[in-house]
From Swiss-Prot:
GO terms for cellular component: cytosolic small ribosomal subunit. One of its GO terms (biological process) is translation. SUPFAM superfamilies: Ribosomal protein S5 domain 2-like. One of its GO terms (molecular function) is RNA binding. Pfam families: Ribosomal_S9. The gene is rpsI. Belongs to the universal ribosomal protein uS9 family. It comes from Acidovorax ebreus (strain TPSY). Keywords: Ribonucleoprotein, Ribosomal protein. This is Small ribosomal subunit protein uS9.
């Protein structure tokens, strides 16, 4: 579908990102702020831009990302997943390359719940033999 706006929803851990892209100069805004301001760490910015770098569309699209929930790492992963889906919505021929890189698959790893009688999900009380 080639229209004015292409969109995609990405998820990672407890973060959800709604991504909207259109032809432009390469400006990326996250929750109304520039991506450099929103994500403090350079690795988070790099993770979010990976699909664009892979498909050589870094300077091609203006992207608006609305993301909520989770922390910085989860939000960057959700943004990457959403950008991937929006790129596929824009041009379906990009899907094999993005799939080969592993960006299309949703990372299903979630935090394991804390169990009763344990300190955390798996950490038990120290065992004393005597």
């Amino acid at each position: 579908m080639i229209g004015e706006w292409n969109n995609g929803t990405g998820r990672r851990k407890s973060s959800v990102a709604r991504v909207f892209l259109k032809k432009g100069s390469g400006k990326i805004t996250v929750n109304g702020k520039d991506i450099q301001q929103y994500f403090g760490r350079e690795t988070s910015i790099m993770i979010a831009k990976q699909p664009l770098a892979l498909t050589n569309h870094v300077e091609t699209f203006d992207i608006q990302i609305n993301v909520h929930g989770g922390g910085e790492s989860g939000q960057a992963g959700a943004a990457r997943h959403g950008i991937t889906r929006a790129l596929i919505d824009y041009d379906a021929t990009l899907k094999p390359a993005l799939s080969q890189a592993g960006f299309v698959t949703r990372d299903a790893r979630e935090v394991e719940r804390k169990k009763v009688g344990l300190h955390s999900a798996r950490r038990a009380k120290q065992f004393s033999k005597r």
